[in-house]
């Protein structure tokens, strides 16, 4: 059984793209291995609906996303608007159940690694407390190097088991832009965390074949054997 948390440097770093790409990859190339998707907390409409549309999951909505809040805000603020508390035991119990039933469980975090999930805890704290191997998505843009270094420092401070970095083209990028804005060798040298590759810009993020092909270009073998 394999469990992986996908987090990012920020809200729009590309967590959902990487999560769906990995799910498409394993379902395409390893069809005998079952894959479950989990979004422990969600604020606003988004990932759980996309997951069900893309993969025709047998998982009920409350299993994909145990804690849902209507307002597209940080979870503690969204929960406050609804006069609700955030009980992390519910998504934890869901994760335990999924681990018992599926070969692979992909967990998508909310916001960025430093984003709050309660008034006291961040995504980094959740990754540590749940003992999750973690991938960090860094968008390819000016400032990507500094974002990567800062988030890896946060991961180390929090005790996160950070396994790798994936660079993601949130907009069409040339090879020159990628090399100058998010040089993999420099990021690896500064963080001592391997960069597993670059996800290209995907205009159609519902094309399973394209998603699987994009994930296939990542150095997943090195990551899985680490």
Swiss-Prot record:
Its EC number is 6.3.3.3. Keywords: ATP-binding, Biotin biosynthesis, Cytoplasm, Ligase, Magnesium, Metal-binding, Nucleotide-binding. GO terms for molecular function: ATP binding; dethiobiotin synthase activity; magnesium ion binding. ATP binds at residues 12-17, 47, 108-111, 168-169, 200-202, 207. This is ATP-dependent dethiobiotin synthetase BioD. One of its GO terms (cellular component) is cytosol. GO terms for biological process: biotin biosynthetic process. It holds the Pfam family AAA_26. The active site is at 39. Coiled coil: none annotated. It catalyses: (7R,8S)-7,8-diammoniononanoate + CO2 + ATP = (4R,5S)-dethiobiotin + ADP + phosphate + 3 H(+); (7R,8S)-8-amino-7-(carboxyamino)nonanoate + ATP = (4R,5S)-dethiobiotin + ADP + phosphate + H(+). It comes from Cyanothece sp. (strain PCC 7425 / ATCC 29141). It is found in: Cytoplasm. Homodimer. Its main location: cytoplasm. The keyword Disulfide bond does not apply. The keyword Metal-binding applies. Catalyzes a mechanistically unusual reaction, the ATP-dependent insertion of CO2 between the N7 and N8 nitrogen atoms of 7,8-diaminopelargonic acid (DAPA, also called 7,8-diammoniononanoate) to form a ureido ring. This cyanobacterium does not encode bioA (which catalyzes the formation of the precursor for this reaction in the cannonical pathway), instead it encodes bioU, which replaces bioA and also performs the first half of the cannonical BioD reaction. Thus in this organism BioD has a different substrate. InterPro entries: DTB_synth_BioD (IPR004472), P-loop_NTPase (IPR027417). Its cofactor is Mg(2+). Mg(2+) binds at residues 16, 47, 108. Belongs to the dethiobiotin synthetase family. HAMAP family: BioD.
